[in-house]
């Protein structure tokens, strides 16, 4: 991966924020591309390992890489993902394989005790709402929604793309059950804890026994 770029106009090394081939990057004063989150003045740049800026934050306001303000819902979901990444960094090690990190995150979710905090009402950004039960106030426990939404966000933080949270009813009450779906397989932390760990860790829908009525992608 190239860490230095030069301006086609001046021939000098890029310094600071630059748009290259439609993507945004940040270079330090020596012209080296940053590949970790970076603070410049009052702005925090959230940067992927490929150097591409994913978002910016100034004060309490979140922006897209291009400087456009994120809608409140989108900003809330992105900040939830940042919390998930912080948890992953805290509970895994660089020497772990991807599958080891994945299962470590699953086990971290299971350690939280059961507690129903609210009745499901299909709230705006409800996957992030329930994930923050553990990311922000984990000592208060959570239910199947908290478990599954948290694990879904942790999976996204690990780089998994096809991540969903599912519910087996379209009712707005406490009758539904929630689980995570990742790459087409079911991951149900609550059932793994209460019934059979491996039966509900990476289950097929044929063996799982429930079908999704609500299915929401976690981005």
Model-based region annotation:
Residues 1-78, 167-181:
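Extracellular adhesion/carbohydrate-binding repeat motifs centered on closely spaced tryptophans
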Residues 217-219:
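Short, solvent-exposed mixed-charge patches
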Residues 122-126, 141, 170-172:
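A glycine-rich, coil/turn loop motif that links secondary-structure elements
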């Amino acid at each position: 991966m190239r860490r230095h770029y030069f301006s086609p106009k001046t021939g000098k090394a890029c310094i600071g924020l630059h748009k290259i081939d439609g993507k945004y990057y940040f270079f330090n004063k020596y012209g080296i591309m940053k590949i970790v989150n970076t603070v410049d003045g009052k702005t925090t740049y959230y940067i992927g390992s490929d150097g591409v800026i994913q978002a910016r934050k100034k004060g309490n306001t979140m922006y897209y890489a291009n400087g456009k303000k994120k809608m409140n819902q989108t900003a809330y979901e992105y900040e939830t993902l940042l919390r998930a990444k912080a948890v992953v960094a805290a509970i895994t090690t660089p020497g772990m394989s991807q599958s080891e990190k994945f299962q470590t995150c699953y086990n971290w979710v299971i350690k939280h005790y059961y507690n129903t905090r609210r009745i499901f009402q299909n709230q705006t950004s409800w996957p992030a709402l329930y994930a923050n039960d553990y990311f922000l106030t984990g000592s208060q426990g959570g239910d199947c929604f908290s478990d599954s939404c948290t694990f879904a966000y942790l999976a996204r933080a690990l780089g998994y793309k096809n991540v969903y949270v599912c519910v087996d009813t379209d009712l707005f009450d406490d009758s539904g059950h929630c689980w995570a779906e990742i790459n087409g397989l079911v991951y149900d932390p609550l059932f793994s804890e209460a019934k059979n760990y491996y039966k509900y860790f990476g289950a097929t829908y044929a063996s799982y026994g429930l079908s999704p009525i609500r299915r929401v992608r976690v981005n």
